[in-house]
Amino acid sequence: MNTLVIVLIAAVCLIAGYTFYGSWLAKKWGIDPKAKTPAVAKNDGQDYVPTDGWTVFAHQFSSIAGAGPVTGAIQAAVFGWVPVLLWILIGGIFFGAVTDFGALYASVKNEGKSMGLLIEKYIGKTGKKLFLLFCWLFTLIVIAAFADMVAGTFNAYETVDGVTKLSAQATVNGAAGSISLLFIAFAVVFGLLQKKLQWKGWKEMVLGLACTVAAFAIGMNVPLVTSKATWTYLVFAYIFLAAVLPMWLLMQPRDFMTTFMFAGMILGAVVGLVVAHPKMNLPMYTGFHNAASGDLFPILFVTVACGAVSGFHSLVSSGTSSKTIANEKDMQKVGYGAMVLESLLAVLALC
């Protein structure tokens, strides 16, 4: 089957889900454009900052869309592309997007409280403690895994027979590391300029794109060749800064710039499908059991998580995005819209 047809069908389903089901939820839940959001009522210039809806969308999408929707869809394809596609579409429209939208809605309607405080309010202190303990343990695992992966990716050295030397990919790895560091630096510059200029629309996009291009252009020509240990320290230093700096200074501009990379990746994939018209070479269905991976249930639903439904997204919706929503009407595109776009990304990875 032509993969372009698969992507078009998926896109139509996801757009329809956003337009009809997402809008129905917004109406059913009582989204009020005239209501004062926590970002407006509690504006402190740190965590609670009224922000343009598309900027919040960029933050939400960049925060939830990482390697998960890409690698998950590819890994689950051992069961065939049809069950993976069906789960991405059904899960994304009726589970994932609803979860993200619902968490965002609940937080905005409750003074911007994070998920832990919401659980304390509606379930009790024991529920809150259990949830926060789980989040703490989960975060430790994720941070440790990703820090090691990132440091390993940027590492310029390799050890062969007990001898440490520069690897053949030292320059490439160093350039990738430089781009990442400069990306953070330019994100701060972007945040400072945006704070002063208050640009919106195309002006904000041009400024963000210019900072993104500058980070790539300089980083590719000035590789930082260093060890994995050094990169590990740098990664944890960045994690600390991201945790303590105001939203508008680092996280929001960083995610806004990251969206350009995701958009470029999606656009490139679509252009490739339109030009090449590749056929789906994977079998439609290989059976309920796979010798290497196990049974379709629960493996399919474990591997395709971020592309269909992920509880982690609720931490983003209630932890950061809810505190920057300037108008309740933006909640649908931020909560529901970012998730269905991630589902489309998963479909592209599958194709």
Predicted ranges, named:
Residues L14-P38, Q60, I90-S114, K195, ...:
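Juxtamembrane transmembrane-helix boundary signature
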Residues G191-K195, A210-Y233, A242-A243, A263-G287:
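Hydrophobic alpha-helical segments and their helix-loop junctions in multi-pass secondary transporters
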Residues D52-G68, A229-L245, T259, V271-P278, ...:
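Hydrophobic, membrane-embedded alpha-helices of multi-pass small-molecule transporters
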Residues A16-V70, D295, I299:
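Membrane-interface "cap" regions at the ends of multi-pass membrane proteins
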Residues K42-F57, F61, V108-L140, T171-A175:
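Transmembrane-helix boundary/entry motifs in multi-pass membrane transporters
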Residues A10-F20, C135, L140-V142, A210-A215, ...:
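Selective recognition of specific alpha-helical transmembrane segments in multi-pass small-molecule
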Residues N2-T19, A76-A106, G116, G177-F183, ...:
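Extracellular loop-to-transmembrane helix junctions
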Residues T51-N110, K121-K125, V142-E158, K333-C351:
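Membrane-interface helix-loop-helix modules in multi-pass membrane proteins
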